[in-house]
A protein has these predicted regions:
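Conserved structural scaffold segments of CAZyme catalytic domains across common CAZy folds
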Residues: 20-119, 125, 277-312, 322-327, ...
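Disordered, acidic Ser/Thr/Pro-rich linker "stalks" and the adjacent N-terminal cap
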Residues: 292-296, 307, 451, 465-469, ...
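C-terminal beta-strand-rich structural cap/linker in extracellular carbohydrate-active enzymes
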Residues: 369-422, 428-433, 455-499
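Bacterial N-terminal signal peptides
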Residues: 7-18
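Active-site-proximal substrate-binding groove within the catalytic cores of carbohydrate-active enzymes
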Residues: 174, 180-369, 379-391
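Aromatic- and carboxylate-enriched substrate-binding clefts and catalytic-loop regions
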Residues: 71-257, 648-653
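Surface beta-strand/loop "capping" patches
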Residues: 306-327, 398-431, 669-690
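Surface-exposed beta-strand/loop patches in extracellular or lumenal glycoproteins
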Residues: 335-354, 424-444
Length: 800
């Protein structure tokens, strides 16, 4: 394996040296094709990665390569592999040897199996105070490229600035590295490198990190958390020699693919597509989309380097066209609550030269759809759904896609590996589509739809495809009602608590795992387990699961790493049993006296129990490190709350007839305020009524609270036939006990989300908004769906 790796790398280096004279000192020009990258920040934080976890992650990317043909050019270690925050390291240190017992060799070899090179986060200095120390640093950094074939350094001011007296040493080191690899990528994050700045390939665009609802949060209402990310713009001159920090796949994952389309095909910087953190947290059915976008970009990356900004008055915010005179990719977006239809001009306005009488138009996102041939100079209409992006190709060339269909929306699952091209056919319930197979680059010997042979498709004939279900009578995305001011209701407390019990304060990554569900893919499961089983993830005590794991060494705690994250330093403890339950007692355990703060041992406390969020039964117990809360007299209950939450709890359990009960449906939160405490008292209310007679799969309600309301100053919920339904999600996200950094917030324009379940259909619903101050807002309710509520069939085409 090592001999093969060295041979392959020698071939790469030889080809690079042939055009070394054409590359500038920074290793790339504005027309250098992009490189795809993953970097590991948030998969680990400043403690750094380990060899074991990295191998697991690399095997995940190898699975994407082997299953879908996806190629990742660069896998970059983030902080802590060698250097760390405010400190330089060495590959000879005990710390490094503990993290990487066999060094970088096995990792470089694993990466090479799927065509990937490693990269690393580091500082620009570390040259010490003597010539020998400086030489040791230079040799170590150069060896990463010369011996282990690294392709990227991400140099960050978090480690430290380059001392002026080391400018020449840095310049010498980088010249040595570029002798080995002229196209080596050097990312400059907020550094003054003096004369060595010329070695920088990129600079950080706007200084923005893209961890959703941590460093990038919505400040306007929207159907999802990533709307602010979708509003990002490219540099004014469309320079590509900058870096936008990529697309974070760790938190608030819905609509991630729109974010990636705009990053890869819109901004299309020198690193694109660029992702980071925890892509294994996507759902199993989303990995084909991830691979498809990487593959599509790779197919066309040579021409995507030339960009054209389209007139905003015609094409909307930050519409871009990329490509050459015969093929263009156009990115459109819609940052409003209603669908927007744009007219794409098929001529020089969008970058096409007149070399053909007709232009082929195909949409690639949010699904693939043939939009037909049109005369050069004509217009074609494309509708962009609310708070979404759309990717369209216009071309006068012959089709380059391996598989191309017309007459039906579809997504490509796999057209690269194995002998079968797999396509997901999409259609609305109860609708019929006339599908044809277009001339494309692949040739096929057989075709089946859901296992049924469809030979007519291979003969160029139309095939009728009908999807099950009842045809929708209304748009899946629509406005339902505008809430009107009213008196604060007597049950405002119940409306408030419904959302406290529906939501959680877990780390954002734990929320993403819940969103995506179990995986059937071993490589995905291994990467998830490697992340969540890290000792630091457990040690930071940021997941309510640790209350119910029968492990006295784990805990769920109020995080104070970044100060007091509670609103007005106040929060209660909320426990949802998941169903009405009869218990003799609830037992809460903690480590020590400090951990039960603000409670004090042997003092009497009240807990409150409820079956319906409206009627609460107080019970008295004695506080301590093991608290027995008597619940038998209250009868069946589902909800338990403490007005004041202990800082740290290790276990919460229930006992019935002397036996511990199952806790698999239990969950808890610890950052929400008790109603009536810490400024949490409704002073204004808005109410809206509507009848929900139709909702497609994946539908959810958006209660958009438009206007200024202050941080944590607005709340929302539903009432249905006297029952209270909370909002389990909100943008910006509810407060969390964070893994990497504290969650962001906004003082305006919250959007609360409620998934639509079958028991809501055909019912009269009341939507409520409460505010805790005197500011005026304008709440309204929308219904939408994610993903688009298509039914699906699978088309399999056996390749010749």
């Amino acid at each position: 394996m090592k001999r093969l790796l060295s041979f392959c790398f020698a071939l790469v280096c030889s080809s690079l040296l042939l055009f070394a004279q054409t590359l500038p000192t920074g290793g790339a020009t504005e027309t250098t094709p992009s490189k795809s990258e993953y970097f590991s920040w948030i998969n680990n934080t400043n403690e750094g990665p380990t060899a074991e976890q990295t191998l697991t992650n690399l095997r995940f990317f190898q699975w994407l390569h082997d299953r879908y043909g996806m190629v990742l050019d660069l896998y970059a270690f983030d902080a802590g592999a060698i250097d760390g925050a405010k400190i330089y390291g060495s590959m000879r240190s005990e710390r490094f040897k503990k993290q990487f017992p066999e060094g970088f060799g096995p990792l470089s070899e694993q990466a090479a199996l799927s065509g990937t090179r490693l990269g690393i986060w580091c500082g620009p200095d570390g040259f010490g105070s003597t010539d020998s120390e400086a030489q040791e640093r230079e040799d170590m950094m150069a060896s990463l490229v010369e011996k282990y074939h690294f392709g990227l350094f991400k140099m960050d001011a978090v480690c430290g600035q380059l001392r002026p007296e080391q400018y020449n040493r840095f310049d010498r080191m980088m010249k040595r590295i570029r002798q080995t690899d002229p196209g080596f990528v050097l990312l400059n994050h907020r550094l003054d490198l003096g004369p060595g700045t010329a070695h920088s390939t990129t600079f950080l665009l706007g200084g923005e990190e893209t961890y959703i609802d941590v460093h990038m949060t919505n400040d306007f209402t929207a159907t999802h958390h990533r709307a602010k990310a979708l509003s990002r713009t490219s540099p004014k001159d469309l320079t590509r020699l900058t870096e936008d920090h990529g697309v974070c796949l760790s938190s608030c994952l819905d609509y991630w693919e729109d974010d990636l389309v705009l990053q890869a095909f819109g901004r299309e910087l020198i690193l694109a597509p660029e992702i980071y953190a925890n892509p294994w947290l996507l759902r199993d059915d989303e990995f084909p989309t991830l691979a498809f976008l990487f593959n599509l970009h790779r197919d066309y990356r040579d021409i995507l380097v030339k960009g054209l900004r389209l007139p905003a008055e015609k094409y909307g915010h930050e519409a871009l066209s990329r490509g050459n005179a015969t093929t263009r990719f156009i990115t459109l977006r819609n940052l409003t609550w209603n669908p927007v239809t744009y007219e794409i001009q098929l001529d020089s306005e969008t970058g096409l030269d007149k070399k053909s009488k007709r232009v082929k138009v195909r949409q690639y996102h949010p699904y693939i759809l043939d939009l037909g041939y049109h005369p050069y100079g004509s217009k074609v209409q494309v509708t962009v759904e609310p708070f979404r992006a759309t990717l369209v190709k216009i071309t006068t060339e012959a089709e380059r896609d391996g598989i191309a269909l017309s007459g039906i929306p579809y997504q490509i699952i796999n057209d690269r590996t194995g002998g079968t091209t797999e396509v997901k056919l999409l259609g609305m319930p109860g609708c019929t589509y006339q599908m044809t197979l277009e001339r494309c680059t692949q040739r096929f010997s057989s075709a089946t739809i859901d296992g049924k042979t469809e030979s007519a498709l291979l003969k160029g004939q139309k095939v009728s495809v009908t999807f099950p279900g009842q045809k929708p009578q209304k748009d899946f995305h629509r406005h339902l009602t505008t809430l009107q001011p009213c008196q604060v209701p007597n049950d405002a407390e119940s409306i408030y608590y419904a959302t406290c019990f529906a939501a959680d304060n877990n780390a954002l990554e734990a929320r993403s795992l819940k969103r995506s569900g179990e995986t059937r893919i071993p490589e995905v499961k291994a990467a998830r387990d490697a992340f969540f089983n890290q000792s630091l993830f457990q040690g930071r005590e940021l997941w309510d699961r640790y209350l119910f794991d029968s492990n006295p060494t784990t805990a769920f705690s109020i995080s104070f790493r970044f100060g007091d994250s509670r609103t007005n330093s106040s929060s209660g403890f909320f426990l949802d049993l998941g169903a009405l339950t009869e218990l003799d007692e609830v037992i809460m355990e903690s480590f020590d006296e400090y951990s039960i703060t603000p409670l004090k041992s042997e003092e009497g406390q009240n807990a409150y129990l409820s079956a319906d969020l409206q009627h609460w039964t107080p019970v008295t117990f004695r506080s301590g490190t093991r608290m027995h809360i008597p619940t038998k007299a209250a009868g069946a209950f589902r909800y338990l709350r403490l007005p004041d939450c202990p800082f740290r709890l290790t276990e919460v359990s229930g006992v019935r007839n002397g036996q511990s009960v199952d806790r698999s449906k239990w969950h808890a939160s610890n950052l929400f305020r008790t109603y009536g405490q810490g400024g949490c008292q409704a002073t204004q209310a808005w109410k809206g009524q509507f009848h929900l007679d139709e909702a497609l799969e994946g539908s959810y309600l958006c209660i958009a609270v438009n206007g200024e309301h202050g941080a944590e100053g607005a709340w929302a919920g539903l009432k249905v036939e006297g029952k209270y339904i909370g909002c389990p999600d909100r943008a910006p996200s509810y407060k969390c006990n964070p893994w990497e950094f504290q969650s962001g917030n906004s003082e305006k324009n919250y959007t609360f989300y409620i998934p639509i379940t079958a028991d809501l259909i055909g019912k009269d619903l009341e939507a409520w908004t409460l505010t805790f101050n005197d500011q005026q807002v304008k709440p309204e309710v929308w219904i939408t769906a994610y993903p688009i509520p298509f039914q699906q069939k699978e088309l399999h085409l056996q390749r010749k």
